[in-house]
């Protein structure tokens, strides 16, 4: 098996990318948090302690944890990578020609460790030691950001997702997250862990405007046996799914993409906030959103250039057929109607499967975790009182790059 390979949602998890977003979280305020796609300001100290616990939990299960900031710092050791990244992140069109050049010169004075921290965590105008002949600088408040922080990098699942033997470097839906993709492009292109391997790359062209073809990894479930399940959501569009499907089929990395329609609502912004795969025939679902009658389409290749797209009448039957199963064990969100809604909001259904029947989940979702336990699912609990306020659970916060198939 290629070391860079994700063959399922439930096979043995071997290696993941996580991000510990200290600088970015410290730049969140009540004034800017909504523009940065957070509902509230997190306690930085508590969030980092919770993230450290998450890392330790994975390492105790023999999962190799790579941190995004370390990968970016190591990538910046390559002069070509550094030049490319600064060219695209500090462009003339974003800052104006004179100001952009001076920002780049200033950033090049920093160590790779400091530069990685700034690119991920942000930089305010007041931190610049120079005054440029720039209207942008002159018109900006000193505490505005020259380089906006990227706190959503916490959710490494979204920006890139490995699908069998390839990786999708996703065109993000929201402006606050679009810069994230170039960090992953640089890492996958130049970091020694990836640059010496041959693997398929989707949406890799940084110069292409992908328009309405947006896709985020939280909507992508690699359910195994050559099938991919994708949610049509507020972040992932039909155009994005069809373009991904075409690339998967062209590179022979999948035989079928199953698309299901989600409500365009923040409480279920991605498929994995309402549905995750826990064991061979076991799924966690939020029943107010996921049911057998929801809109469902099967996408398969039609020759070399076209897609065969069929609307399907029963989602559960499509899922069982794809996985070659006779039945499904559906575990719904726990508690009464009020408790289930609260626990889904706090990512009760967003679990990270370590191996069949073993998952990492927030300990606060007691009603749902109890149902998992009764169904024979072993829960590795982590604290998520702060991290969960970012609207993401263990699956959201992890990007597997090596996982066994089924």
Curated annotation (Swiss-Prot):
It is an enzyme of class 3 (hydrolase). It is found in: Cytoplasm. GO terms for cellular component: cytoplasm. Signal peptide: none annotated. GO terms for biological process: arginine catabolic process to ornithine; arginine deiminase pathway; bioluminescence. It comes from the Bacteria. GO terms for molecular function: arginine deiminase activity. Its EC number is 3.5.3.6. InterPro entries: Arg_deiminase. It catalyses: L-arginine + H2O = L-citrulline + NH4(+). The active site is at residue 396. The keyword Cytoplasm applies. Pathway: Amino-acid degradation; L-arginine degradation via ADI pathway; carbamoyl phosphate from L-arginine: step 1/2. Belongs to the arginine deiminase family. HAMAP family: Arg_deiminase. This is Arginine deiminase. It comes from Aliivibrio fischeri (strain ATCC 700601 / ES114) (Vibrio fischeri). The lineage of its organism: Bacteria, Pseudomonadati, Pseudomonadota, Gammaproteobacteria, Vibrionales.
């Amino acid at each position: 098996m290629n070391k860079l390979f994700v063959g399922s949602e439930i096979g043995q998890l071997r290696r993941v990318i996580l991000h510990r977003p200290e600088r970015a979280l410290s730049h969140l305020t009540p004034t800017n948090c909504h523009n940065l796609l957070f509902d509230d300001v997190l306690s930085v100290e508590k969030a980092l302690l919770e993230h450290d616990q998450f890392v330790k939990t994975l390492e105790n299960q023999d999962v190799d944890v790579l941190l995004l900031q370390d990968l970016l710092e190591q990538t910046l050791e390559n002069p070509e990578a550094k030049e490319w990244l600064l060219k695209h992140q500090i462009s003339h069109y974003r800052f104006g020609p004179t100001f952009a050049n001076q920002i780049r010169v200033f950033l090049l004075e920093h160590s790779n460790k400091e530069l990685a921290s700034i690119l991920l965590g942000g930089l305010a105008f007041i931190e610049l030691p120079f005054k440029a002949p720039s209207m942008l600088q002159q018109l900006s408040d000193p505490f505005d950001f020259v380089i906006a922080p990227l706190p959503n990098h916490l959710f490494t699942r979204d920006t890139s997702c490995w699908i069998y033997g390839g990786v999708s470097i996703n065109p993000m839906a929201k402006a606050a997250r679009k810069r994230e993709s170039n960090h992953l492009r640089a890492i996958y292109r130049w970091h020694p862990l990836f640059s010496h391997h041959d693997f398929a790359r989707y949406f890799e062209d940084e110069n292409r405007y992908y328009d309405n073809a947006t896709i985020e990894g939280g909507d992508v479930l690699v359910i195994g046996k050559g099938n991919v399940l994708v949610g049509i959501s507020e972040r992932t569009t039909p155009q994005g799914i069809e373009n991904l499907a075409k690339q998967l089929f062209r590179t022979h990395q999948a035989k079928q993409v199953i698309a299901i329609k989600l409500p365009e609502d923040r409480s279920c912004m991605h498929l994995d906030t309402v549905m995750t795969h826990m064991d061979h025939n076991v799924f966690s679902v939020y029943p107010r959103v996921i049911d057998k009658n929801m809109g469902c389409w099967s996408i398969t290749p039609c020759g070399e250039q076209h897609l065969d797209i069929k609307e399907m009448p029963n989602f559960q039957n499509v899922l069982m057929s794809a996985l070659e199963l006779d039945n499904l064990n559906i575990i719904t969100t726990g508690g009464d109607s009020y408790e289930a809604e609260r626990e889904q909001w706090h990512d009760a259904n967003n679990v990270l499967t370590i191996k069949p029947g073993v998952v990492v989940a927030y300990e606060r979702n007691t009603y749902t975790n109890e149902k998992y336990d009764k169904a024979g699912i072993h829960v590795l609990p982590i604290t998520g009182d702060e991290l969960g306020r970012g609207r993401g659970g263990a699956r959201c916060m992890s990007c597997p790059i090596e996982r066994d198939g089924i």
